[in-house]
Amino acid sequence: MTPVKKTHSTRRHRQTRKWIAVVSILLVTAMLLTLAYFWYPVKNPSSDEPPGFKAFTDHYLGVMKNIDASKTKAELASQLNSKYNQTDLFAWEQSKLTFVQDPTGWFEDPNQILNSGRGICVQFSIVYVSACLALGYQSRLVVAADTTNWNFIHVWAEDYYNGTWVHVDPSDKVWNSPSRYQSWDWGKAIGSEVKIYAFQDGKFQEVTKTYSRN
């Protein structure tokens, strides 16, 4: 029997079938991936964040960025005695600001706050942290937030002293008393509906445990 010789057309036909098979596999794979995407969508990491959390953290990161700006610190330093320590700054601020609950005319820029001469816990804490940073001390802003809506409940500061962060509440005129908020009637418990965050150097850190009973 004479063997059948393979012609060019036969080889082309086989190659065509191979390419068709490859393309078919790719199309089927693409269809399966598309179906998988819609049935099992890739989880966006940000979806783990509760609604309002990013806006809350972004806001106070922005406040700290302005506080830490070279221009802000230079303007504030010009109003301070370079020999002031944190205790002096605490007393200096009390002489400059009056606690007023009226919500009109609030500022979050330290120099504007000082010009207005008034504020609540937010303004007192911003000015205090700004003054500390202006004189080269380590200080950060601390915010207690209602996690049901991510609005602030109270704001204070922490100073870095002897290797640890020390509680400072400029508007309440107290130092190193982190347990005091446990008895405050916020209508919500610290650690469950109330979370506490510290803001510094473009970052934030949850510090709820420092101020809770647990």
Question: Where is each model-derived feature located?
Answer:
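N-terminal targeting leaders characterized by basic, low-complexity, disordered sequences
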Residues: 1-12
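Intrinsically disordered, low-complexity segments enriched in Ser/Pro/Gly/Ala and basic residues
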Residues: 6-8, 23, 46, 191
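N-terminal Sec-pathway targeting helices
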Residues: 10-28
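Solvent-exposed, well-ordered amphipathic alpha-helical segments
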Residues: 13, 29-31, 84-85, 132-137, ...
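Membrane-interface motif at the C-terminal end of an N-terminal transmembrane signal
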Residues: 31-46
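Secondary-structure boundary elements
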Residues: 45-119, 151-152, 163, 201-214
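Hydrophobic/aromatic-rich core segments of domains that either
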Residues: 68, 123-189
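Aromatic- and glycine-rich peptidoglycan recognition patches
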Residues: 181-214
